[in-house]
Amino acid sequence: MEPHGHSGKSRKSTKFRSISRSLILCNAKTSDDGSSPDEKYPDPFETSLCQGKEGFFHSSMQLADTFEAGLSNIPDLALASDSAQLAAAGSDRGKHCRKMFFMKESSSTSSKEKSGKPEAQSSSFLFPKACHQRTRSNSTSVNPYSAGEIDFPMTKKSAAPTDRQPYSLCSNRKSLSQQLDYPILGTARPTRSLSTAQLGQLSGGLQASVISNIVLMKGQAKGLGFSIVGGKDSIYGPIGIYVKSIFAGGAAAADGRLQEGDEILELNGESMAGLTHQDALQKFKQAKKGLLTLTVRTRLTTPPSLCSHLSPPLCRSLSSSTCGAQDSSPFSLESPASPASTAKPNYRIMVEVSLKKEAGVGLGIGLCSIPYFQCISGIFVHTLSPGSVAHLDGRLRCGDEIVEINDSPVHCLTLNEVYTILSHCDPGPVPIIVSRHPDPQVSEQQLKEAVAQAVEGVKFGKDRHQWSLEGVKRLESSWHGRPTLEKEREKHSAPPHRRAQKIMVRSSSDSSYMSGSPGGSPCSAGAEPQPSEREGSTHSPSLSPGEEQEPCPGVPSRPQQESPPLPESLERESHPPLRLKKSFEILVRKPTSSKPKPPPRKYFKNDSEPQKKLEEKEKVTDPSGHTLPTCSQETRELLPLLLQEDTAGRAPCTAACCPGPAASTQTSSSTEGESRRSASPETPASPGKHPLLKRQARMDYSFDITAEDPWVRISDCIKNLFSPIMSENHSHTPLQPNTSLGEEDGTQGCPEGGLSKMDAANGAPRVYKSADGSTVKKGPPVAPKPAWFRQSLKGLRNRAPDPRRPPEVASAIQPTPVSRDPPGPQPQASSSIRQRISSFENFGSSQLPDRGVQRLSLQPSSGETTKFPGKQDGGRFSGLLGQGATVTAKHRQTEVESMSTTFPNSSEVRDPGLPESPPPGQRPSTKALSPDPLLRLLTTQSEDTQGPGLKMPSQRARSFPLTRTQSCETKLLDEKASKLYSISSQLSSAVMKSLLCLPSSVSCGQITCIPKERVSPKSPCNNSSAAEGFGEAMASDTGFSLNLSELREYSEGLTEPGETEDRNHCSSQAGQSVISLLSAEELEKLIEEVRVLDEATLKQLDSIHVTILHKEEGAGLGFSLAGGADLENKVITVHRVFPNGLASQEGTIQKGNEVLSINGKSLKGATHNDALAILRQARDPRQAVIVTRRTTVEATHDLNSSTDSAASASAASDISVESKEATVCTVTLEKTSAGLGFSLEGGKGSLHGDKPLTINRIFKGTEQGEMVQPGDEILQLAGTAVQGLTRFEAWNVIKALPDGPVTIVIRRTSLQCKQTTASADS
């Protein structure tokens, strides 16, 4: 059949080209003429269509359109009868296809005729490639969509779907938003977010859609009444912005035209394409109140609209899409009447219309995309705006199919893309070629009928698609090379196997044939050779033509998914004779890569070894793929992915094919979807998770990416990795022995015995096969426990597991810590840690040991005072605790001292000799290793087996901050500010590291590691009480804070606790404890920076606080942020401290404090959204390190209550006593008509609450610029006290003052006073 179409095309291509150009009618009935015209037809698009792939080209283009339109429903309805006759009609298809006149339209037209007369013929007509191509070109947009989507049962059954499949491949590739619809379509598959799942349902890729403008009124302080979902950062990959839900009582609900699932293309003429979710939200928030114009793509039928109660929204969407009530009528379900009324509905003529576009004015053409219906498929004109260029021209009509715009064929373009082309045409003549029936009434009627059919198809498409013949669906799906999303949808829908195959087949064939087309070129390159590759990598084809080629690395996973479809492929093969050879190749490829994908990694179980997984992946037909639906498949994918990520695994392939996270996510998701299909209906839930697995691995290591729970992902990934890799690493590396303590040592000294003991203790089946690297952890990853920190502390204190552990690990651990202690490797370790963190996604067995070693060395180096890693860890921990208690509140100082005393005792115990220290040291070292995410996980497991004190939660918490440390280095700013920020970021990163190590060390009972300097005569006295207080504090401790001045003192050599007051002593202990956590390299840098600071900057350190909050995973920090570089360039400050939040309980962070960094991420120069993102990311870890700066005004705000000048003066003096930074100055300024030359902020009832009135900005050109400075607090104005006044009232006071000299009493920080006092006195 295909050769038939090709030969006809080649013979008559020239002739028909000229004919088509002259708008000659073609008789679709004559199979010979039809075929040749059809083929000739493609000739105009010959570049893409030649090779009999013309159909592919068109189909792919149309597929994209179909995607948007979601037209597959119509094809299903139209082709229902045809599908039954597919086999018989197969021979006739080529002939009927030839009937198609010029392009997709001609093909669709012929299909209509055929369908009208002999349904068998129409279906067959759809199948022949030449026909298919035309069908695709005309209906492919519909067919590919339907075939790939909801209408699989019917549309796929018909031959048209096969033609469209190539189109679908192209289209899928073309429109990511449409692709999104596909994966979403499968409700069976659990989506990562409810919104996405809903979107998927709404987006049902087979539905027809229209683009329309909706005008909504935005009130002040009010939204538009709907929420959005999607964006280029979606877990499904780059997609458009969709309406998630519409709120009752909102503007959108009142308007009634916008409906859930609509894609928002433009806002007030600004494209929403390529925006992240946050950017889109910001656009809506920044939109000014008033009328907003939304350009939306509305599906004529959405799954909800299938229900009777949803039909009204459908009508609304139709009307809105048409931008007029008239539109709804043409598309209403009732309007469709059989276009068969016309004698020859398949006839088509090509008309070229040139419209003159004016600058800033659109053409007024309303577009819609509908699925294949008889002779209707593609992108059509559904309405003309009254008074528009197109309307006044009068040559375009409703029902015209768009064929070319500016000499560019649109068959392979999606509805969104065609709309973009039309809306962005340059001013001047815009040539548009349309295809229509000679009788415009027929074209319009056909369009109405197609829309109605699409609506009906949506209603019944899902069921049909589930119940339709599997063989037909498979054939069609195999013909349709759908993107990953499509595949996922199909998988989720009833026919997963054949879908995967269809996707593979189509994508490969399409890609090979579509090389000429923008979307298909990549596919064309690799389509032919990919058959084998595809077998290996079913995913790649689904991802995209380009991806198909690269998927080879990911082949192992895909084969598993696709293996079950093999029988289906065989069935398809029986049908394929009707189809092109391409389809055969595709089918074969599909089967090879059709193995079901593993279930969600969260539920990952290592039932099969990684090798088995790999083998299964390689073997498409291997029954293991089917037998191991969840555990084996998941392990197969997870382990190979983790192991092969470095070697260009599926992720690399995906990235190469589709640059950007979207492509990779789509690929993985599609693969998962396919595997799930084959495996079972339940498996679909895993697809979403599996792609996330890859992401998580990467995200876990970069703290910035915390969209998902890093620990859950890391633990899952690590389990997979560790079972094969980590065990090997542990056995090979001493670090891991330290890390896992019992495990490592046992593994090295007596691997079997130690491991078995640990396993038995934990009661978790841990099989460590270092040699195989296929270690399988049957038990789920140890989940972090909210109270792990407190529990570990209590357990350490009360329990004597140290002696137990020492016997097991002592010999092995002691030597390793010593070797790791050397400071030389430490700096490298710190840098390597960061690098490794950033590349955690690529971690491997070899890397893990290195990381562990580096981690260990780092910790020892950070604790310079102690040579042994164990001691250092303990010291750090105790120091941190001590610091927290000391800094957080003065009343905690005693607790800190007692803690320090307790720690000294423990340290003394360890200090006496290495032999004693090794047991504790071993634990500390293990914890030290734990900072590395992989190591932590391992140690967690081992620790869990060992005892509750050693439970992994602490390690996990530690590992999380490690990722943050990288970001800590971030931005160094100008002069003083930059220095302060750099120091704060270094400290926060160091504290994060220390915290990571801290919980483990505490749990291990390594509190003893405290610098000897810290140990004071007082400390021994408070040992027992300190231990209790410490344990209790840890149990109920929400966090602690520490003043940077304390660290400065320590770094300057003021480390002797006895030199200063108790407060100073406590602070020095705190500083020492924090500094002990730093590596030698980091400490040296910090000291150098502190030494370079001038006195003024050093004084500012007193107002900078490092606050460490201990919290549950997912819990907020208890405060909100205000300000940002995009909001009047204001610094990020604490907007509000929630009464019962962590920050409020800890007490250091106050409203108005400037936030310098969070978890090592500097907020200097950050926009408000960036700051909020960083704050949200801080939810995931169990600890949060916040560096804040408290202004003197804030520090002394409580004292500013008096309203008279005397009271204010006294208050100022009191403040100066408490805070050495503030002084009162009297300044005389000259008042002019322009005022005093400065602006005010604060005052009673300000945005930040009741604040003192301060000078916000000095106006340029004012002489008093040197007299006053921003930040000065205004106490009096010409003898009038302004305390307690609002800013408005204060301005009224200033305005009432006469022109001339005005005496002002201000309060200024000591840093500013030196510069201003002299001028003020003079």
From Swiss-Prot:
SUPFAM superfamilies: PDZ domain-like. Residues 729-741, 856-865, 896-907 have a biased composition (Polar residues). Pfam families: PDZ. Residues 1099-1195 are annotated as: Interaction with PPP1R12A, PPP1R12B and PPP1R12C. Synthesized as a chemo-attractant inactive precursor which is proteolytically cleaved by caspase-3 to yield IL-16. It is found in: Secreted. InterPro entries: IL-16, IL-16-like, PDZ, PDZ_sf. Residues 480-493, 569-588, 604-621 have a biased composition (Basic and acidic residues). Residues 104-147, 480-633, 651-695, 729-963 are annotated as: Disordered. Keywords: Chemotaxis, Cytokine, Cytoplasm, Nucleus, Phosphoprotein, Repeat, Secreted, Transcription, Transcription regulation. Residues 507-526, 651-672, 827-839 have a biased composition (Low complexity). GO terms for molecular function: CD4 receptor binding; cytokine activity. The keyword Cytoplasm applies. GO terms for cellular component: collagen-containing extracellular matrix; cytosol; extracellular space; Flemming body; focal adhesion; nuclear speck; plasma membrane. The modification Phosphoserine is found at residue 917. Residues 213-299, 352-437, 1105-1190, 1226-1309 form the PDZ domain. Isoform 1 is expressed in neurons of the cerebellum and hippocampus. Isoform 2 is expressed in thymus, spleen and lung. Residues 183-449 are annotated as: Interaction with GRIN2A. Homotetramer. Isoform 2 interacts with GRIN2A. Isoform 1 interacts with GRIN2D, KCNJ10, KCNJ15 and CACNA1C. Isoform 2 interacts (via PDZ 3 domain) with PPP1R12A, PPP1R12B and PPP1R12C. Isoform 1 interacts with PPP1R12B. Isoform 3 interacts with GABPB1. Isoform 2 interacts (via PDZ 3 domain) with HDAC3. Interleukin-16 stimulates a migratory response in CD4+ lymphocytes, monocytes, and eosinophils. Primes CD4+ T-cells for IL-2 and IL-15 responsiveness. Also induces T-lymphocyte expression of interleukin 2 receptor. Ligand for CD4. This is Pro-interleukin-16. The lineage of its organism: Eukaryota, Metazoa, Chordata, Craniata, Vertebrata.
